[in-house]
Amino acid sequence: MRWRHPPAVVAAPPPAPVDAERLLRRLEWRVLRRLDGALHGDYRGLLLGPGDDLADLREYQPHDDVRHIDWNVTARLGVAHVREYHEDRDLTAFFLVDLSPSADVGAHTSRASVALEFVALMARLLTRRGNRVGALRYRRSVDAIVPAGGGRRHVLRLIHTLSQPSAAARAAPARAGTRLHELLEAAQPLLRRRSQVFVLSDFLTEPGWEKPLARLAQRHEVVAVRLTDPLDGELPDLGLLLVGDAETGEQILIDTGDRGLRRRLSRAVEQREAALQAAFGSAGVDALELSTDDDVVEALTHFVRLRRRIGARRDGEAGGPATGSAPRGALS
C-alpha cells in the first residue's frame, strides 16, 4: 500500500499581504485591456444597476454602434432599432469576500489569490467608470470593512486591506467552520441604496446562508462568485492519504484506492452541486464559477454573453425590448 502526503490538497498558510500597486498595475495592463477588447467596452450583463436602465428604442442611424441593435425588436418591426441607455455613473458596488481557511487551498494557486485578483479587477473597472466600491472580509469572522469610495487610490487601499493578516482569525477557535451567513447579514445595514453585490466564496460553509442571500437579492443586484478548484470533485488515487479539513484542522487517514469511497465522494459532490444550484435559483441570484485554473477574461466574457443571451430570449418571448440583462437566477 502506498503512502503519500498530497502536495496539492493540503491547506497552505494564509497568503502574505500583496503589493497592491504591483498587482493593480499588472491587472490594468494585462487583464483589463483584454477584457475591454473581448467585450468591446460594453459591460452590460456584468455591471448592473441604474446605469443599465433602458432609456429609449429608436430606429438605427448610420452613425450608431451596431452592437446596440435590438434584434428582437428589429425582427418584429422589420426595421433596425437600437437601444439607448441612461448614463448614470453613480453605481455603488460591494464585494463580500469569504477568505476563511478553505480559501487558502488550491491545486496550483489558492482561492484567496483568485478572489483578490477578481476584486481588484472589478473594483478598478467600476471606479474607472466613475462608480464607488467597498468591501467586507470574512476569515473566522467579519474582520475588515472598507467603506465605499472611488478612484484608483481607493482601490489600492481596498486591495491592501483585504490582503492583510487577520488578528481575529488567529484568535478564533481552531475548530470553527465558516459561517457565511454572518458576512451576508453584516452587509445589510451598509447597503442603504440599491447596489451591485459580488459574493465571493467557495460556499463550503455551515447551513443558514441561503435566506440572508435571498434577502440581499431582494434589494440589490447580486452575483455569487463561486471559487472552485480542479481538485474539488476529484480524489487522486495515491493509496493511503492523510487529508485535512482546512476549516476545522481535523485530519483523517483514507485509502484513496477504495472504490466505494470514491463512489460516495462522487455522489456527495453531485448532491452538493445540486443543492448549491437550487439555493442560488431560489434566491434569484446568478452564479459565476471561477476556478483557480480559469482565465478570468474568458470566464467573465462567457458569463456576460450568457446573461445577455438569456435576457434577450426572455424579453423576446415576452414581446418587450431586450435590455441585455439575464433574469435573476437564470444562470444558476
What are the residue ranges of the model-derived segments?
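Exposed, interaction-prone extracellular/peripheral surfaces
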Residues: 1-46, 59-64, 73, 82-120, ...
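Acidic, metal-associated active-site segment
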Residues: 56
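N-terminal low-complexity, intrinsically disordered segments
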Residues: 67-77
